[in-house]
Structure formats: C-alpha cells, structure tokens
C-alpha cells in the first residue's frame, strides 16, 4: 500500500511538471549582421516621381560591397518557440524558430541587403513585414520605427511596433504577442485616423518562409488582390492552378 501511494505521488508530480509552462520572456540585444546599405536621401522632392507618398523622399543608391552593422533585436521566447523583431528594419518580425527541432518557420535572413523595391526604394527580404497606406511596400519598411516591450499579467510578452504614415497622417501599431503556453505568436494591428477626413487606404503583411515543393498555404477567403489592386480568385485561379500549393506557383 505504501508503495502504491509512493507511485501515485510520483505520477501526480510528473503530470504537474509536464503540464506546467513557464512565463514567456522578452529581451533586447544587439547582433552584428552583414549589411548592403543604401545612400543618403535624394535631394529632389518626390513630387516629381511619386507625389502619392509626399513628403517622403527617396533613396536611390545601393552599396555593392558589404559592411558590418549592429542591429537591435527584440527576442520573445517561451518553452516552444523563439520570435525575433527588428525595430530598425521597419519593425518587422525578423524570424521565428521552433525550439525542439531548431527549424525556422519564419525565414530569418542574416544578410540585410537593401535593393530598390519599396515606394521609397530600399527593401530587404525575410521575416514578416507590416504595410499600411498606399499599395506597395510601406515608406518606413527599411527605417527605424517606434517600439515598446511589455510583460503581461497572463504570462505572455509583447512587443508593440508602430509609426506615422505621413501622406495620410494616420498612425499604425502592431502588437506581436507570445503566449506562455502556445507554439505560435499573435499579431494585433491597430490603424488610427486622427483626422476628420475619411480616407481609403489598405493594410497588408508580407511573410517569408523557407519554400519547398510541398509547401501549402492555409488561409481563408476566396479572392486576393494583385499589386495593381485588381481582384482575382483564390485559391484556384483562371488557369486552373491551385495557388495555395507552392509547387503550382511556377509561372
């Protein structure tokens, strides 16, 4: 009987410790990355090339040789995953790792190579990018944004990134929150128009993941928008391709 009670005691404690999750943790540190930087701003007003994003200016020069630069990294971590955020690169989710395997499920690009892609010019691949305003990669996608970090009462942690969109005078915020007991993180976007004027803009996110032929996209909806704003069918397009399968995106 004593042996039975002892075994039950051990079993109950094993169940308790197995089901217990420590609080998520959040930290800041600097990491040296290889950088292909962009130039000083173009002194010619952007009114001559793209007046939709005035008063922003453009960056037109790009380095061919790399250098090293320290970037601030915000790390959110629980028992299951790590999430990395870069406030100096538009506040993007830089990458995410599943801890038991060490595999990335959000692509973390260790090389910051700016090239002429966004509305102001510089853009770099990888992670999850937040875009608000005019259709295109947001003007602040390659430059620092505001951020704060929080430890929440439920054991989760949050990093909130945000900025002002100058053409519309609107303000955007995105909270990246990591619960203590989930192998996933949440994003919660807020877009605030402090002006008395109604304005028609849009919000979109670009996410990067390591791509193989067996990659599939599980996302709701029955249509999508092209860069031009034209609506198309999802996931089966007009050519009969199932666009939710990466292997059928070979155009």
Locations of regions flagged by a protein language model:
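Bacterial Sec-dependent N-terminal signal peptides
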Residues: 1-23
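A short, polar/charged loop/turn motif at coil->beta-strand junctions and beta-hairpin connectors
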Residues: 2, 20-21, 70, 153-155, ...
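A broad, low-specificity signal marking well-ordered, structured residues that form hydrophobic/aromatic
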Residues: 19, 74, 83, 94, ...
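Extended effector regions of multi-domain proteins
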Residues: 22-46, 51-57, 72, 78, ...
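N-terminal short leaders/motifs
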Residues: 22-43, 114, 122-143
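Polysaccharide-binding surfaces and accessory modules of carbohydrate-active proteins
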Residues: 23-27, 101-129, 149, 186, ...
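Extended, loop-rich substrate-binding clefts of extracytoplasmic carbohydrate-active enzymes
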Residues: 45-68, 73-77, 125-184
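Acidic, contiguous internal or C-terminal segments within carbohydrate-active enzymes
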Residues: 77, 83-101, 161-212
């Amino acid at each position: 009987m004593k042996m039975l009670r002892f075994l039950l005691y051990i079993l109950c404690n094993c169940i308790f410790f197995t089901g217990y999750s420590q609080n998520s943790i959040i930290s800041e540190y600097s990491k040296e990355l290889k950088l292909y930087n962009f130039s000083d701003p173009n002194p010619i007003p952007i009114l001559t090339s793209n007046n939709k994003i005035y008063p922003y200016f453009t960056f037109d020069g790009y380095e061919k040789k790399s250098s090293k630069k320290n970037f601030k990294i915000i790390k959110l971590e629980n028992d299951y995953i790590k999430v990395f955020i870069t406030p100096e690169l538009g506040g993007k989710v830089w990458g995410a790792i599943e801890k038991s395997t060490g595999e990335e499920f959000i692509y973390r690009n260790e090389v910051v190579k700016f090239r002429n892609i966004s509305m102001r010019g510089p853009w770099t691949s990888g992670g999850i990018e937040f875009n608000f305003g005019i259709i295109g990669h947001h003007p602040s996608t390659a430059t620092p944004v505001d951020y704060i970090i929080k430890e929440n009462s439920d054991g989760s942690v949050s990093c909130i990134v945000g900025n002002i969109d100058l053409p519309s005078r609107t303000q955007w915020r995105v909270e990246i929150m990591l619960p203590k007991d989930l192998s996933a993180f949440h994003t919660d976007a807020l877009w605030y128009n402090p002006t008395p004027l109604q304005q028609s803009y849009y919000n979109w996110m670009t996410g990067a993941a390591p791509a193989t032929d067996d990659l599939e996209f599980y996302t709701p909806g029955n249509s999508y928008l092209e860069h031009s704003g034209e609506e198309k069918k999802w996931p089966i397009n007009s050519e009969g391709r199932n666009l939710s399968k990466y292997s059928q995106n070979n155009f």
